[in-house]
Amino acid sequence: MILSNEPGYYRTGHYGIRLENLIVVRPAEPIPGGEIAMHGFETLTLAPFDRRLIRADLLTAAELRWLDAYHARVRDEIGPMVGGEVLAWLEAATAPL
């Protein structure tokens, strides 16, 4: 099953921001003590988040690790399909925070 994950924040009369990715439901690794099969999500949409809109000082260490890992995946999967200026942009856009 494919879903749209759309976390957002809207301030009435001022502005709004929303991040949107498509995700697919996949079987997950069993957890210790788990009695039933579990599922998790895998991100399908691979595009870097705009670094100009990220305040890294407001993110936890775990959030920074997730974002850097996501950007590494974007770079690893999209990078081989592009070259030249596009690759240079992608490498800059997905560099670790």
Predicted regions and their residues:
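Charged, cofactor-coupling segments
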Residues: 1-97
